[in-house]
UniProtKB/Swiss-Prot annotation:
Originating organism: Drosophila melanogaster
Family: Belongs to the GrpE family.
Record-given protein name: GrpE protein homolog, mitochondrial
CDD domains membership: GrpE (cd00446)
GO MF annotations, alphabetized: adenyl-nucleotide exchange factor activity; protein homodimerization activity; protein-folding chaperone binding; unfolded protein binding
Stretches for region Disordered: 35-55
Subunit-level organization: Probable component of the PAM complex at least composed of a mitochondrial HSP70 protein, Roe1, TIM44, blp/TIM16 and TIM14.
Entry keyword set: Chaperone, Mitochondrion, Transit peptide
């Protein structure tokens, strides 16, 4: 083979060797890149796999803590409501004790008012003009009773005069029935004794007569 014919062959061989070297170098670079990229992914997957039980445990503990917190909050709200109700009941009892503590004393004074009322009614009205002493006595009784009723009113004690009202068993005590066509049945047509209430509480029912049904 001549030198001119061998020269192209040598150049082709050199190109082939260079090409193989280049391909091998690229493959190695790709392999290294693949290995470098894959290692973090595998490490992440392995780490996630290893941490899954711990995450699950923490999730369960968090759920249990939330449930316990909800139960404690519910108990706290119930206790707070119970305390508020108890405080309101106690305040009402104290208020009632202040208001109705004089109830028995008021009942005793009612007898005095009744006596003054009976005495006033017993005075013959037709003789007042001709008897100055009787007139002064009548006026004195009337003024005394009026003053006593004013004291009652200042302390929340007021009379109950249910004439012509519908009979109420909570405030009235029926002593008898009476025929009366001018009113509806079960109406108070006569009051023999006034009732009294202390701050809207009836402490003595009125003694009454009612119309027949």
């Amino acid at each position: 083979m001549s030198a001119k014919a061998a020269l192209p062959l040598q150049m082709f061989g050199r190109r082939l060797v260079h090409l193989r070297s280049s391909v091998t170098s690229q493959n190695m670079s790709a392999l290294r890149l693949y290995s470098t990229e894959k290692q973090p992914e595998e490490a992440t997957e392995q780490k996630a796999t290893e941490s899954s039980p711990e995450v699950e445990k923490l999730t369960k503990e968090l759920a249990a803590a939330k449930e316990q917190n909800a139960e404690l909050m519910d108990k706290y709200k119930r206790s707070l409501a119970d305390s508020e109700n108890m405080r309101n009941r106690l305040n009402k009892q104290i208020s009632d004790a202040k208001i109705f503590g004089i109830q028995s004393f008021c009942k005793d004074l009612l007898e005095v008012a009744d006596t003054l009322g009976h005495a006033t009614q017993a005075v013959p009205k037709d003789k007042l003009s001709g008897n100055a002493d009787l007139k002064n006595l009548y006026e004195g009784l009337t003024m005394t009773r009026a003053s006593l009723l004013q004291v009652f009113k200042r302390h929340g004690l007021e009379p109950l005069d249910p004439i012509n009202q519908k009979f109420d068993p909570n405030q009235h005590e029926a002593l008898f029935q009476k025929e009366d066509k001018t009113v509806e049945p079960n109406t108070v047509v006569e009051v023999t004794k006034l009732g009294y209430k202390l701050h809207e509480r009836c402490i003595r029912p009125a003694l009454v007569g009612v119309s027949k049904c």
